[in-house]
Every structure is written in structure tokens, then in C-alpha cells.
């Protein structure tokens, strides 16, 4: 009966017969909840470490990807530049070929003219020699 009157007053005895303000069942549940919370906090801490490691890994991979992307862009630009240089060089060579063809044609005309002059001079010399 004394226990009931103490219980009504909000006082309880635990398993060691110590006087407590909380009901022993509530105290036990509070202790269990406290341990579950501690386990939960530990798991959250571990989860944050794992996630932090994954974030670092993803950041590292993103940097490597960005570097490779920049290398690929540089290589593509270099290839475009080389193609443009080759095209310009090809145009220069075509222009040089056209110039050399024109020069060859002038030389051919000059050669034909000189051959004609030589033939005329040889004919003149032959006529001159025949007259003597």
C-alpha cells in the first residue's frame, strides 16, 4: 500500500529498491531509446564518412573527366588547325603550279621564237656562204 501511495505521488522504486521519480518501465524505455539514439548517431556518422568519401571520389573523377575533356578539345582544335594549314599549303602549291605552267608556256614560246630566229640566221649564213 505504501508503494501504491508513492506511485500515486509519482515516486517509484527500481529493481535495486532505489527511489526514482520515473516509472521503472519508462526509465528502461528511456535507457533503450538513449542507446538506440547513440547507435543511430554512430551509424549517421559512419554514413557521413562514407558519403564524404564518395563525394571526394566523384569530385576527383569529375576533375579527371574535365581534364580529359580539355585534352580532347585541344586535340580536336589541333587537328582542325592542321587540316586548315594543309588546305592553305595545298592552295599555295596549286598557285605555284599554275605560275610554273605559265612560265613554262612563256619559255616554250620564247624557245620557238629563238628557234625561228636561229633557223633564219642559219639560212642567212647559208645564203651568204653560197654567194661567196
From Swiss-Prot:
One of its GO terms (cellular component) is cytoplasm. This is Intraflagellar transport protein 20 homolog A. Keywords: Cell projection, Cilium biogenesis/degradation, Coiled coil, Cytoplasm, Cytoskeleton, Differentiation, Golgi apparatus, Spermatogenesis. Involved in ciliary process assembly. May play a role in the trafficking of ciliary membrane proteins from the Golgi complex to the cilium. Regulates the platelet-derived growth factor receptor-alpha (PDGFRA) signaling pathway. Plays an important role in spermatogenesis, particularly spermiogenesis, when germ cells form flagella. The gene is ift20-a. GO terms for biological process: cell differentiation; cilium assembly; protein localization to cilium; regulation of platelet-derived growth factor receptor-alpha signaling pathway; spermatogenesis. Residues 87-112 form a coiled coil. It is found in: Golgi apparatus, cis-Golgi network; Cytoplasm, Cytoskeleton, Microtubule organizing center, Centrosome, Centriole; Cell projection, Cilium; Golgi apparatus. InterPro entries: FT20 (IPR028172). The keyword Cytoplasm applies. It comes from the Eukaryota.
